[in-house]
Amino acid sequence: FMKRKSTIWFVLFLFPMFLTAENNAFGVPDSSEIRSGLIETWFEASLMTVRENIPEIYSNKAGQEFQVRLEETDSSFNVFVSPHMTMNVDVYTENGKYTKKQDVYPGDAPGSWVLIRNKKDGKPIRIRYYFLSNSEVYIQFTPYNKTSLCDLVIFGNYAVKGIPTGVPFSRFYSASLAEVQRITKSNVPWNYLEYDPTLYHSVHQMAGVIRERLPNIVYHKDAMIDENDNLVEFGSGRPIKLEEGTEKLPLSSSGFIKWVADGLVEPVAGSKLKRLPLLTQTVEYKDIGYQGVLSQEYSLSFALDFVRNISSAVLSVNTGTVYRFNESGVDVTLEPFVAGLSENGIVNPVTFSNDSGYNINVLKSLFYILANSEPGVIYFGAIRQTDNKTPEVKVFNNN
Protein backbone atom coordinates (compact mmCIF):
# COMPACT_ATOMS: atom_id res chain seq x y z
CA PHE A 1 0.00 0.00 0.00
CA MET A 2 1.55 3.24 -1.12
CA LYS A 3 1.11 6.05 1.38
CA ARG A 4 2.76 9.16 -0.03
CA LYS A 5 2.56 10.76 -3.44
CA SER A 6 6.02 11.81 -4.49
CA THR A 7 6.24 12.71 -8.18
CA ILE A 8 3.88 12.88 -11.10
CA TRP A 9 4.25 12.30 -14.82
CA PHE A 10 2.23 14.02 -17.48
CA VAL A 11 1.74 13.13 -21.05
CA LEU A 12 0.33 15.35 -23.74
CA PHE A 13 -2.82 14.26 -25.55
CA LEU A 14 -3.43 16.55 -27.92
CA PHE A 15 -9.99 39.93 -14.62
CA PRO A 16 -11.54 42.04 -15.36
CA MET A 17 -10.14 44.65 -17.78
CA PHE A 18 -9.53 48.20 -16.64
CA LEU A 19 -9.15 51.58 -18.33
CA THR A 20 -5.52 52.46 -17.67
CA ALA A 21 -3.37 55.58 -17.62
CA GLU A 22 -0.69 53.75 -19.61
CA ASN A 23 -1.70 50.69 -21.58
CA ASN A 24 -0.14 47.38 -20.57
CA ALA A 25 -0.64 43.87 -21.85
CA PHE A 26 -2.60 42.84 -18.75
CA GLY A 27 -5.04 45.75 -18.66
CA VAL A 28 -4.40 46.60 -15.01
CA PRO A 29 -4.57 50.07 -13.40
CA ASP A 30 -1.38 52.12 -13.69
CA SER A 31 0.01 54.05 -10.70
CA SER A 32 3.31 55.16 -12.25
CA GLU A 33 2.46 58.88 -12.42
CA ILE A 34 1.28 58.77 -8.80
CA ARG A 35 4.41 56.99 -7.60
CA SER A 36 6.69 59.51 -9.30
CA GLY A 37 5.49 62.10 -6.76
CA LEU A 38 5.95 59.88 -3.69
CA ILE A 39 9.67 59.14 -3.86
CA GLU A 40 10.94 61.63 -1.29
CA THR A 41 8.05 61.42 1.19
CA TRP A 42 7.26 57.69 1.05
CA PHE A 43 9.96 55.67 -0.73
CA GLU A 44 13.22 57.29 0.46
CA ALA A 45 12.15 58.90 3.75
CA SER A 46 13.09 57.37 7.11
CA LEU A 47 10.75 54.96 8.85
CA MET A 48 9.94 57.62 11.45
CA THR A 49 8.94 60.07 8.72
CA VAL A 50 6.91 57.49 6.80
CA ARG A 51 5.05 56.60 10.00
CA GLU A 52 3.89 60.20 10.21
CA ASN A 53 2.26 59.91 6.79
CA ILE A 54 -1.41 59.08 6.87
CA PRO A 55 -2.91 56.79 4.19
CA GLU A 56 -3.68 58.92 1.13
CA ILE A 57 -5.91 58.50 -1.90
CA TYR A 58 -4.66 59.59 -5.33
CA SER A 59 -6.17 59.37 -8.82
CA ASN A 60 -4.32 58.76 -12.07
CA LYS A 61 -5.12 60.41 -15.41
CA ALA A 62 -7.73 57.78 -16.14
CA GLY A 63 -9.55 58.67 -12.91
CA GLN A 64 -8.62 55.44 -11.13
CA GLU A 65 -8.07 55.72 -7.40
CA PHE A 66 -5.06 54.32 -5.52
CA GLN A 67 -4.35 54.25 -1.81
CA VAL A 68 -0.83 54.86 -0.51
CA ARG A 69 -0.22 53.38 2.94
CA LEU A 70 2.38 51.91 5.28
CA GLU A 71 2.31 48.40 6.71
CA GLU A 72 4.95 46.98 9.06
CA THR A 73 6.27 43.53 9.93
CA ASP A 74 8.85 42.58 12.55
CA SER A 75 11.73 43.08 10.13
CA SER A 76 10.44 45.32 7.33
CA PHE A 77 8.20 48.27 6.54
CA ASN A 78 6.23 48.17 3.34
CA VAL A 79 4.74 50.98 1.27
CA PHE A 80 1.74 49.94 -0.80
CA VAL A 81 0.25 51.77 -3.76
CA SER A 82 -2.94 49.80 -4.32
CA PRO A 83 -5.90 50.29 -6.68
CA HIS A 84 -9.45 50.84 -5.53
CA MET A 85 -11.84 47.90 -5.58
CA THR A 86 -15.23 47.16 -4.03
CA MET A 87 -16.38 44.06 -2.24
CA ASN A 88 -19.78 42.91 -1.02
CA VAL A 89 -20.08 42.74 2.76
CA ASP A 90 -22.95 41.10 4.63
CA VAL A 91 -24.20 43.30 7.46
CA TYR A 92 -26.28 41.75 10.22
CA THR A 93 -28.69 43.86 12.28
CA GLU A 94 -31.61 43.21 14.57
CA ASN A 95 -33.82 43.59 11.50
CA GLY A 96 -31.98 40.95 9.50
CA LYS A 97 -29.15 40.87 6.99
CA TYR A 98 -28.35 43.18 4.10
CA THR A 99 -25.43 43.48 1.71
CA LYS A 100 -23.45 46.67 1.15
CA LYS A 101 -20.48 47.52 -1.03
CA GLN A 102 -17.27 48.41 0.76
CA ASP A 103 -14.28 50.24 -0.67
CA VAL A 104 -11.04 48.26 -0.37
CA TYR A 105 -7.46 48.65 -1.57
CA PRO A 106 -5.91 45.15 -1.54
CA GLY A 107 -2.14 45.07 -1.45
CA ASP A 108 -2.01 42.16 -3.88
CA ALA A 109 -4.75 43.22 -6.31
CA PRO A 110 -3.99 43.51 -10.05
CA GLY A 111 -2.20 46.83 -10.46
CA SER A 112 -0.84 46.92 -6.91
CA TRP A 113 2.77 47.94 -6.27
CA VAL A 114 4.75 47.47 -3.04
CA LEU A 115 8.16 48.64 -1.83
CA ILE A 116 9.67 46.52 0.95
CA ARG A 117 12.41 48.12 3.08
CA ASN A 118 14.62 46.86 5.90
CA LYS A 119 13.44 48.12 9.28
CA LYS A 120 16.94 48.34 10.77
CA ASP A 121 18.65 50.52 8.18
CA GLY A 122 15.83 51.61 5.86
CA LYS A 123 17.50 50.12 2.79
CA PRO A 124 15.21 48.80 0.04
CA ILE A 125 14.85 45.03 -0.17
CA ARG A 126 12.58 44.63 -3.17
CA ILE A 127 9.79 46.11 -5.27
CA ARG A 128 6.96 43.87 -6.35
CA TYR A 129 4.34 44.33 -9.09
CA TYR A 130 1.04 42.43 -9.01
CA PHE A 131 -0.74 42.28 -12.35
CA LEU A 132 -2.98 39.18 -12.33
CA SER A 133 -6.11 38.26 -10.40
CA ASN A 134 -4.08 35.54 -8.69
CA SER A 135 -1.44 37.18 -6.50
CA GLU A 136 0.78 34.09 -6.53
CA VAL A 137 2.05 35.30 -9.91
CA TYR A 138 4.19 38.45 -9.74
CA ILE A 139 7.38 40.13 -10.89
CA GLN A 140 9.84 41.67 -8.44
CA PHE A 141 13.11 43.59 -8.42
CA THR A 142 15.97 43.70 -5.93
CA PRO A 143 18.86 46.18 -5.73
CA TYR A 144 22.29 44.98 -6.83
CA ASN A 145 25.18 47.46 -6.65
CA LYS A 146 24.17 50.30 -9.00
CA THR A 147 21.66 48.22 -10.93
CA SER A 148 18.89 45.73 -10.14
CA LEU A 149 17.92 42.10 -10.56
CA CYS A 150 14.58 40.63 -11.65
CA ASP A 151 12.55 37.59 -10.56
CA LEU A 152 9.35 36.23 -12.11
CA VAL A 153 7.49 33.98 -9.67
CA ILE A 154 4.65 31.69 -10.76
CA PHE A 155 2.88 29.93 -7.91
CA GLY A 156 5.97 29.56 -5.76
CA ASN A 157 8.43 28.72 -8.55
CA TYR A 158 10.89 31.03 -10.27
CA ALA A 159 10.60 31.23 -14.05
CA VAL A 160 13.58 33.59 -13.89
CA LYS A 161 15.64 34.53 -10.85
CA GLY A 162 18.31 37.18 -10.42
CA ILE A 163 18.28 38.32 -14.05
CA PRO A 164 20.19 41.63 -14.51
CA THR A 165 17.95 44.46 -15.74
CA GLY A 166 20.66 46.98 -16.65
CA VAL A 167 18.76 49.81 -14.93
CA PRO A 168 19.01 51.30 -11.41
CA PHE A 169 16.69 49.94 -8.74
CA SER A 170 15.24 53.43 -8.24
CA ARG A 171 13.88 53.30 -11.81
CA PHE A 172 11.12 51.03 -10.52
CA TYR A 173 9.91 53.62 -8.01
CA SER A 174 8.01 55.19 -10.91
CA ALA A 175 8.15 52.63 -13.73
CA SER A 176 4.81 51.49 -15.13
CA LEU A 177 4.10 47.83 -15.80
CA ALA A 178 4.34 48.58 -19.52
CA GLU A 179 7.83 50.00 -18.94
CA VAL A 180 8.74 46.96 -16.85
CA GLN A 181 7.76 44.77 -19.78
CA ARG A 182 9.91 46.83 -22.15
CA ILE A 183 12.93 46.66 -19.81
CA THR A 184 12.66 42.89 -19.30
CA LYS A 185 11.28 41.75 -22.67
CA SER A 186 14.49 39.96 -23.69
CA ASN A 187 15.01 38.14 -20.37
CA VAL A 188 11.56 37.41 -18.94
CA PRO A 189 9.25 34.79 -20.56
CA TRP A 190 6.15 36.98 -20.63
CA ASN A 191 4.61 34.47 -23.05
CA TYR A 192 4.12 32.14 -20.06
CA LEU A 193 1.53 34.62 -18.79
CA GLU A 194 -0.36 35.40 -21.98
CA TYR A 195 -4.00 34.33 -21.75
CA ASP A 196 -6.79 34.50 -24.31
CA PRO A 197 -10.12 33.39 -22.78
CA THR A 198 -11.67 32.84 -26.22
CA LEU A 199 -9.42 29.81 -26.88
CA TYR A 200 -10.81 27.48 -24.21
CA HIS A 201 -14.33 26.79 -25.40
CA SER A 202 -13.70 23.18 -26.44
CA VAL A 203 -11.94 22.33 -23.17
CA HIS A 204 -14.71 23.90 -21.09
CA GLN A 205 -17.31 22.06 -23.12
CA MET A 206 -15.54 18.73 -22.65
CA ALA A 207 -15.08 19.34 -18.91
CA GLY A 208 -18.78 20.17 -18.63
CA VAL A 209 -19.81 16.90 -20.27
CA ILE A 210 -17.48 14.87 -18.02
CA ARG A 211 -18.68 16.69 -14.90
CA GLU A 212 -22.29 16.05 -15.87
CA ARG A 213 -21.69 12.31 -16.16
CA LEU A 214 -19.54 11.83 -13.06
CA PRO A 215 -22.49 11.01 -10.76
CA ASN A 216 -23.17 7.93 -12.93
CA ILE A 217 -19.65 6.53 -12.45
CA VAL A 218 -18.45 4.56 -9.43
CA TYR A 219 -14.94 3.40 -8.57
CA HIS A 220 -14.18 -0.27 -9.20
CA LYS A 221 -10.64 -1.62 -8.97
CA ASP A 222 -9.09 -2.63 -12.33
CA ALA A 223 -12.34 -2.08 -14.27
CA MET A 224 -12.52 -0.72 -17.81
CA ILE A 225 -14.63 -0.84 -20.97
CA ASP A 226 -12.77 -2.65 -23.74
CA GLU A 227 -12.98 -2.18 -27.51
CA ASN A 228 -16.00 -4.51 -27.65
CA ASP A 229 -17.98 -2.50 -25.08
CA ASN A 230 -17.46 -5.17 -22.43
CA LEU A 231 -16.63 -4.44 -18.80
CA VAL A 232 -13.35 -6.26 -18.14
CA GLU A 233 -10.32 -6.31 -15.87
CA PHE A 234 -7.69 -3.98 -17.24
CA GLY A 235 -4.72 -6.27 -16.71
CA SER A 236 -6.17 -9.64 -17.70
CA GLY A 237 -9.13 -8.80 -19.93
CA ARG A 238 -11.37 -11.13 -17.90
CA PRO A 239 -15.06 -10.13 -17.81
CA ILE A 240 -16.35 -8.41 -14.69
CA LYS A 241 -19.77 -9.55 -13.54
CA LEU A 242 -21.94 -6.97 -11.85
CA GLU A 243 -24.67 -7.51 -9.33
CA GLU A 244 -28.18 -7.24 -10.67
CA GLY A 245 -29.62 -3.77 -10.42
CA THR A 246 -26.26 -2.03 -10.81
CA GLU A 247 -26.97 1.28 -12.52
CA LYS A 248 -23.68 3.13 -12.28
CA LEU A 249 -20.69 2.51 -14.52
CA PRO A 250 -17.83 0.93 -12.52
CA LEU A 251 -14.36 2.10 -13.55
CA SER A 252 -10.86 2.17 -12.12
CA SER A 253 -8.81 5.37 -12.39
CA SER A 254 -7.16 4.04 -15.56
CA GLY A 255 -10.54 2.86 -16.79
CA PHE A 256 -11.87 6.38 -16.30
CA ILE A 257 -9.04 7.83 -18.41
CA LYS A 258 -9.82 5.30 -21.14
CA TRP A 259 -13.49 6.25 -20.94
CA VAL A 260 -12.51 9.90 -21.55
CA ALA A 261 -10.17 8.95 -24.40
CA ASP A 262 -12.81 6.71 -26.00
CA GLY A 263 -15.19 9.65 -25.99
CA LEU A 264 -12.65 11.56 -28.05
CA VAL A 265 -11.65 8.90 -30.56
CA GLU A 266 -14.86 6.92 -31.12
CA PRO A 267 -16.57 9.65 -33.19
CA VAL A 268 -13.47 9.71 -35.43
CA ALA A 269 -12.44 6.04 -35.55
CA GLY A 270 -15.88 4.46 -35.14
CA SER A 271 -14.68 2.27 -32.26
CA LYS A 272 -13.10 2.39 -28.83
CA LEU A 273 -9.38 1.94 -28.18
CA LYS A 274 -8.07 -1.60 -27.88
CA ARG A 275 -7.03 -2.73 -24.41
CA LEU A 276 -3.90 -4.78 -25.06
CA PRO A 277 -1.74 -2.12 -26.79
CA LEU A 278 -2.31 0.17 -23.82
CA LEU A 279 -0.35 -2.25 -21.61
CA THR A 280 2.88 -2.08 -23.63
CA GLN A 281 5.82 -1.42 -21.33
CA THR A 282 7.62 1.88 -21.94
CA VAL A 283 10.15 1.82 -19.08
CA GLU A 284 13.21 -0.42 -18.96
CA TYR A 285 14.69 -1.33 -15.57
CA LYS A 286 18.21 -2.56 -14.93
CA ASP A 287 18.36 -6.18 -13.80
CA ILE A 288 20.44 -5.23 -10.78
CA GLY A 289 19.13 -3.22 -7.84
CA TYR A 290 16.00 -3.54 -5.77
CA GLN A 291 13.70 -1.84 -8.29
CA GLY A 292 15.09 -3.96 -11.10
CA VAL A 293 14.52 -7.22 -9.23
CA LEU A 294 10.96 -6.22 -8.35
CA SER A 295 10.22 -5.18 -11.93
CA GLN A 296 10.80 -8.76 -13.06
CA GLU A 297 7.83 -9.88 -11.00
CA TYR A 298 5.62 -6.78 -10.75
CA SER A 299 4.70 -3.92 -13.06
CA LEU A 300 6.27 -0.84 -11.47
CA SER A 301 5.30 1.51 -14.29
CA PHE A 302 1.76 0.42 -15.15
CA ALA A 303 0.13 3.85 -14.91
CA LEU A 304 2.99 5.58 -16.73
CA ASP A 305 2.96 2.99 -19.50
CA PHE A 306 -0.79 3.37 -19.77
CA VAL A 307 -0.94 7.17 -20.09
CA ARG A 308 1.92 7.17 -22.58
CA ASN A 309 0.28 4.51 -24.71
CA ILE A 310 -3.22 5.94 -24.58
CA SER A 311 -1.92 9.42 -25.45
CA SER A 312 -0.06 7.96 -28.41
CA ALA A 313 -3.20 6.10 -29.47
CA VAL A 314 -5.35 9.24 -29.38
CA LEU A 315 -2.70 11.12 -31.34
CA SER A 316 -2.65 8.30 -33.91
CA VAL A 317 -6.42 8.48 -34.40
CA ASN A 318 -6.42 12.27 -34.73
CA THR A 319 -3.55 12.38 -37.23
CA GLY A 320 -4.34 9.22 -39.18
CA THR A 321 -0.79 7.97 -38.60
CA VAL A 322 0.06 5.09 -36.25
CA TYR A 323 2.50 6.20 -33.56
CA ARG A 324 4.16 4.01 -30.98
CA PHE A 325 5.03 5.78 -27.76
CA ASN A 326 8.70 6.26 -28.58
CA GLU A 327 7.73 7.90 -31.89
CA SER A 328 4.88 10.07 -30.70
CA GLY A 329 6.57 12.79 -28.63
CA VAL A 330 3.66 12.86 -26.18
CA ASP A 331 5.78 13.19 -23.03
CA VAL A 332 5.65 16.64 -21.43
CA THR A 333 9.29 17.53 -20.72
CA LEU A 334 9.11 21.32 -20.36
CA GLU A 335 11.49 22.67 -17.70
CA PRO A 336 10.45 26.30 -17.17
CA PHE A 337 11.67 26.83 -13.59
CA VAL A 338 15.12 27.62 -12.23
CA ALA A 339 14.25 27.48 -8.52
CA GLY A 340 11.37 27.14 -6.10
CA LEU A 341 10.14 28.61 -2.82
CA SER A 342 9.70 26.42 0.26
CA GLU A 343 9.28 26.82 4.00
CA ASN A 344 13.07 26.65 4.26
CA GLY A 345 13.65 29.35 1.66
CA ILE A 346 14.75 29.06 -1.95
CA VAL A 347 15.51 25.62 -3.34
CA ASN A 348 16.93 24.57 -6.69
CA PRO A 349 14.64 21.79 -7.90
CA VAL A 350 15.25 19.35 -10.71
CA THR A 351 11.82 19.87 -12.24
CA PHE A 352 11.84 16.93 -14.63
CA SER A 353 13.48 13.51 -14.64
CA ASN A 354 13.14 10.97 -17.43
CA ASP A 355 10.82 8.05 -16.52
CA SER A 356 10.22 9.69 -13.12
CA GLY A 357 8.40 12.88 -14.06
CA TYR A 358 7.92 16.15 -12.21
CA ASN A 359 8.18 16.90 -8.54
CA ILE A 360 4.64 17.49 -7.34
CA ASN A 361 5.63 20.94 -6.02
CA VAL A 362 5.87 22.37 -9.55
CA LEU A 363 2.54 21.08 -10.85
CA LYS A 364 0.39 24.17 -10.26
CA SER A 365 3.02 26.40 -11.84
CA LEU A 366 3.53 23.98 -14.72
CA PHE A 367 -0.19 23.65 -15.44
CA TYR A 368 -0.55 27.43 -15.42
CA ILE A 369 2.12 27.78 -18.11
CA LEU A 370 0.76 24.89 -20.18
CA ALA A 371 -2.80 26.22 -19.98
CA ASN A 372 -1.64 29.60 -21.30
CA SER A 373 0.75 28.33 -23.95
CA GLU A 374 -1.29 25.36 -25.23
CA PRO A 375 -5.01 26.19 -24.94
CA GLY A 376 -7.30 23.41 -26.12
CA VAL A 377 -4.87 20.68 -25.03
CA ILE A 378 -5.62 18.12 -22.30
CA TYR A 379 -3.18 16.05 -20.29
CA PHE A 380 -3.24 12.54 -18.84
CA GLY A 381 -1.12 12.01 -15.74
CA ALA A 382 0.38 9.12 -13.78
CA ILE A 383 1.22 9.48 -10.09
CA ARG A 384 4.42 7.92 -8.80
CA GLN A 385 4.09 6.73 -5.20
CA THR A 386 6.31 5.35 -2.49
CA ASP A 387 5.81 2.95 0.41
CA ASN A 388 8.14 4.97 2.70
CA LYS A 389 10.05 1.84 3.61
CA THR A 390 13.72 0.87 3.42
CA PRO A 391 14.64 -0.07 0.78
CA GLU A 392 12.14 2.27 -0.82
CA VAL A 393 9.80 1.11 -3.57
CA LYS A 394 8.50 3.72 -6.02
CA VAL A 395 5.84 2.72 -8.50
CA PHE A 396 3.41 4.22 -10.98
CA ASN A 397 0.49 2.32 -9.53
CA ASN A 398 -2.93 1.46 -10.97
CA ASN A 399 -5.47 2.55 -8.37
Where are these regions (language model features)?
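Cysteine-nucleophile amide-bond enzymes
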Residues: E22-N399
